[in-house]
Amino acid sequence: MNNNYPLGSIAQAVDVLKNEEVIAYPTEAVFGVGCDPDSETAVTRLLELKQRPVEKGLILIAANFEQLKPYIDDSMLTEQQRNTIFSAWPGPVTFVFPALPSTPSWLTGRFDSLAVRVTDHPLVVELCETFGKPLVSTSANLTGLPPCRTSQEVLAQFGDGFPVVVGETGGRLNPSEIRDALTGERFRQG
C-alpha cells in the first residue's frame, strides 16, 4: 500500500480496494465494511471477516444507478416501478433486482437477484466515484456484536490497523430498508 496517503482518506481507501482488501466506511446509519465486487478474493476476505456464508448474498452500494447496471437486469421494470425506485434514490433504501447472468455468484449467493442501493452519503458517493464502481456493503460488525457507529468502534472490533474512512454516519438509527424492485415487497423495515 502507498503510505503517502493520509490515513483514513478516500485515496488510501481506494488504494486498499485496488489491492483486493476490505475497508470500513460510514454509511447512512452505521459503518459498513466493503470491497471490490468484481474481486472474488476481496469478497472472500470480507465473508471470512464477517463469518458470513456466501449463500446469503450481498448488497452493492453505489454513487449512481449507472454504476449498478453491469450487475442488475432492470429490463422488466415498468415505468411506475422505476419511478418508485428513483424517488427513493439516492437514499437509504435498498432494492433487490434480478441479477444479470454475468453477475458472479459470490455476490448473489443462492439467489438470482442482487440487492443494490444508490447512497446519498457524501463520503460514500465520493468513494464510489473515485473507485469507479460500486462497493460490496455490509454492516461493520463481527458476528454477535452490534454494528459499529464510529470509526473508533470499527478499530475496537477489527483491530487498530484496519483501513477505515474517517467520517460520520448519516445519523439514521436503522439500517436501510430493503424492498423488491419488481413487487415492492418489504424484506426489512428501515
Curated annotation (Swiss-Prot):
GO molecular function list: ATP binding; double-stranded RNA binding; L-threonylcarbamoyladenylate synthase; tRNA binding
Keywords: ATP-binding, Cytoplasm, Nucleotide-binding, Nucleotidyltransferase, Transferase, tRNA processing
Top EC class, one word: transferase
Pfam family, any one: Sua5_yciO_yrdC
PROSITE patterns xrefs: YRDC
One of the protein's GO biological processes: tRNA threonylcarbamoyladenosine modification
Domain YrdC-like span(s) in chain numbering: 7-190
InterPro entries listed in its UniProt record: DHBP_synth_RibB-like_a/b_dom, Sua5-like_dom, TC-AMP_synthase, TC-AMP_synthase_SUA5
Reaction catalysis annotation: L-threonine + hydrogencarbonate + ATP = L-threonylcarbamoyladenylate + diphosphate + H2O
EC number: 2.7.7.87
Gene Ontology, cellular component aspect: cytoplasm
Keyword Phosphoprotein tagged: no
Localization terms from the record: Cytoplasm
Function: Required for the formation of a threonylcarbamoyl group on adenosine at position 37 (t(6)A37) in tRNAs that read codons beginning with adenine. Catalyzes the conversion of L-threonine, HCO(3)(-)/CO(2) and ATP to give threonylcarbamoyl-AMP (TC-AMP) as the acyladenylate intermediate, with the release of diphosphate.
Family from the record: Belongs to the SUA5 family. TsaC subfamily.
PANTHER family, sorted: SUA5, THREONYLCARBAMOYL-AMP SYNTHASE
Name of protein: Threonylcarbamoyl-AMP synthase
Native source organism of the sequence: Enterobacter sp. (strain 638)
